[in-house]
């Protein structure tokens, strides 16, 4: 967690929360204002976890169409096609950065994927992908869900553990 600079109580608390979350395999939602280090938090979480020696893959959801996101995550079924992050990241972590920008149809697909993963973890079967999902956002997903712009079921699946990055304005000494 050396990349997360700062000695304020807020940063010390965040580092401790990351260490605790690293031992838990649930999906993590990282929230914070732009520039507050949500990607660094996700990377630090991965490096502290038992998945540290496995891939850490990042998808910036704001940069891709639904079709590209689908291809990047699930891959191409053809023999010589792109395997997709779910296969490439086996045993590791996938960061869904700017998850608030995902279109509603793909949100449904993500919710189904996370439901499958959660069920297999609870049953101890690991039938679904052996991936830890981390989502990051600068938006209030609860508000977006109330406005009908973000699926409630996806929000529930993403909020297994929530980490809040302290705003830069409250850690001016850092």
Describe each PLM feature range.
Residues 146-150:
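Charged helix-capping and loop-helix junction motifs
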